[in-house]
Amino acid sequence: MEYHEAVNFLFDLRRFQVKPGTESIRRLLSHLGDPHEGVSFVQVAGSNGKGSTARMVDAMLRESGAHVGLYTSPHFDDVRERVRVDGRKIPKSALSAFVAEAKPYLVERAADGEPLTFFETVTALALWYFDRAGVDVAVLEVGMGGELDATSAVDPVASAVTNVSLEHTAVLGDTVAEIAKTKAAVAPADAPLVTGTTGEALSVIREEAGDVLTVGDADADSDADVRVSYGGRVNHQEAAVTVETDAETLDVRIPLLGAYQARNAGIAVSLARQVRPDIDAEAIHRGLRNAHWPGRFEVMGTEPTVVLDGAHNPDACAQVATVLDEFDYDDLHLVYGAMHDKDHGEMVGALPEVASVVTCKADISRGEDPEILSSVFERLNGPAVETGGAVAAALDRARARADPDDCVLVVGSLYVVAEARTTWTRAVVPKTHRTLDDARRTLDRANVADAAERSERARRAVNRTVHTRVQRRQARVLREELLSVGGDCAVSGHEFGGELVDVVLTGTLDQFERLTAALEDPPYALAGVAAEIRETLDIEAADAGEDDERGAGDASDAGHDDYPWNDGTAVMGILNVTPNSFHDGGEFYDIDDAVEQARAMVDAGVDIIDVGGESTRPGADEVPVDEEIRRVAPVIEAIADLDVLVSVDTRKAAVGAAALDAGADILNDVTGLEDPEMRFLAAERGAPVIVMHSIDAPVDPSREVDYDDVVEDVIDELTELVLLAEKAGIPRRNLIVDPGLGFGKSKAENFELLGRTDEFAALGCPILVGHSHKSMFSLVGEEPGDNLAATVAGTAIAADRGADIVRVHDVPENVAAVNVALASRDPNRFEADAERED
């Protein structure tokens, strides 16, 4: 079964109405062999905050070393976001395999008049995949209520009810007491039910669940078992929180703003302790600080401040208002869209005073008509109200009217927030087609449905080709406009709204110029897509020189004017001052040997020297911070005056800070900013930072990682890391991306990454390729350990495919390879250099 067929089948199940209860999903799970029976589950229910709490539990358990599944809803761009293992989305191949196995049973049940719903089936998908992935524990966000929710097909080892308010009253009941009763049913058999409820809801939960562990505010609820305090914002991304029990006090930071998130953090810590009683404080600190949760008071930019929040009921809107009070701004400009079944009057009434409003509608049938939403504001609030259409266009208008000291808030629905967020996350990936097979593979990966259409369009895909994901209504416009100027556009076979669809655009540069000019028409809400196409294909725009909507400049202009990667491929020389690094471990452990090697690299033409004090080879032990600083800082200080940039290869922010103090220019983090302090260090010091895609560091050779398409999957995951870094205050011009060859990829996948290096230009950042002497070369018959010839060949390929930096051990040979690759494209640059020397 092809992926688009599987996804279309799942979304077609949305036509079936919700029937509360677990009998249907239990039967499906039985048909699948009861995959849930071998997995430990944590269940998180609540009217608000259950998704944030589930994410915090997931992050802490992963930091403790557990293999963790996470199931949440709804999704933003891709249904696979709902099901994750260790932070990675379920592969397309696994989703397709599940649907192929479950479809006959689901069709039979529908024929009998007992169809399963979309949510029931996707919940079964999650439980099936968690078993297949062999997770240690899985965290489930309850969909609605508790007792009759599909997630209650499992017997949890730990559970929570975050809070209770009026919601889904037609199903759950008309009172807080009734709703609390159904939520209390998630209580585990052998552990207290953790809850942040108060008043009547808490009384009902105590009566229903019996054994309860309460979490409350330290001031108001001094009798709570776990007491939390909210210390307010410490920067524009993080808040200080204290979690206190009779046994310990934890002062932590969380990347989720708002006093209510402090209570969620207390609940999450309690759940993590129940699952892993021996979890240490460091895992709790790092887990909470890495618990990023998109669309929950997510600050996307400054000047003006832009905030995305998926608040979709009155209580959540009131919470947004309290968090906004922590920010200083002049006027508030609102982008508002919501579902038709929500209490719009109460939601609008809970929001703070606004200067202007643009209403909008997400690309989903449940979305409320923007005219109706406008009338609500006109009656209740009285600001300047504009009736909009598409979310992207509404966001553009709000940002255009906001001054630098104002705030733009997108609120009302996670579906609306999801569409707005693509302004920052959408990637336009350039494709190089050397053969018809290359073109066919691009169309296959984009899930173009019809085989004949794939074959026909492959023959046309011989000019410039890019691949991106947009809303279906935007895909229709792209196709019509590109066809009208003589280009071609293939669209994936996804048939249902609310899910982004793949588009593959092919044409000459002239055709793309005409397309992007047409897309500037405001009704299309595609100006952002046009800007990204121009940037990817290096097309001059009428407003050339301005940054795109994400604030990213052209990749070729990324960084300071003097950075060597702005003038062709730069060579980074590896200087390991360790006793055990692979290939050169121990050779430069002595400081005098290290300095001598650095000088030799400079003489050979190196552009950057990368100093590392900890090995990431398989089985390497972690080096304490003090020892790593002792190794790298003196070497960096000794070579800082050389005519070369110096980077430090470390995954620890404390080591990075010491290295910068010693004279380093660049931070090279092989864990992709896993240390939450690293991104703030880079922002504060203004240092470029290399962000690598890695699964494990040190490398775990036994770890098997599933990719559908390793290049596009890595681009997808790096997109969020780049956005995370930008939100911390690092300008995109200071971000360098590393696909992470050798880190959680097979040998064949490493070669795929090398051969398609140019596609990483979609991220708008310089690209680093690190392939030196790696075991990947055994795929082509090279002996492990010393692969100089293969490394040099790889360097030439990387330079030819657009790498901005290559990281290597052997500088002279690789400088020569880079020069040959550059000369093959632009020999005149070398003639000019020779004339200057003469």
Swiss-Prot record:
Reactions performed catalytically: (6S)-5,6,7,8-tetrahydrofolyl-(gamma-L-Glu)(n) + L-glutamate + ATP = (6S)-5,6,7,8-tetrahydrofolyl-(gamma-L-Glu)(n+1) + ADP + phosphate + H(+); (7,8-dihydropterin-6-yl)methyl diphosphate + 4-aminobenzoate = 7,8-dihydropteroate + diphosphate
UniProt keyword annotations, A-Z: ATP-binding, Folate biosynthesis, Ligase, Magnesium, Metal-binding, Multifunctional enzyme, Nucleotide-binding, Transferase
Pathway where it operates: Cofactor biosynthesis; tetrahydrofolylpolyglutamate biosynthesis; Cofactor biosynthesis; tetrahydrofolate biosynthesis; 7,8-dihydrofolate from 2-amino-4-hydroxy-6-hydroxymethyl-7,8-dihydropteridine diphosphate and 4-aminobenzoate: step 1/2
Keyword Electron transport carried by entry: no
Residues at which Mg(2+) binds: 576
Essential cofactor(s): Mg(2+)
Family matches, as InterPro entries: DHP_synth-like, DHP_synth_dom, Dihydropteroate_synth-like_sf, Folylpolyglutamate_synth, Mur-like_cat_sf, Mur_ligase_C, Mur_ligase_C_dom_sf, Mur_ligase_cen
Positions that bind (7,8-dihydropterin-6-yl)methyl diphosphate: 616, 649, 668, 738, 774, 807-809
Region feature (DHPS): 571-838
One biological process term in Gene Ontology: folic acid biosynthetic process
Ranges for domain Pterin-binding: 569-819
Family: In the N-terminal section; belongs to the folylpolyglutamate synthase family.
Protein name: Probable bifunctional folylpolyglutamate synthase/dihydropteroate synthase
Organism: Haloferax volcanii (strain ATCC 29605 / DSM 3757 / JCM 8879 / NBRC 14742 / NCIMB 2012 / VKM B-1768 / DS2) (Halobacterium volcanii)
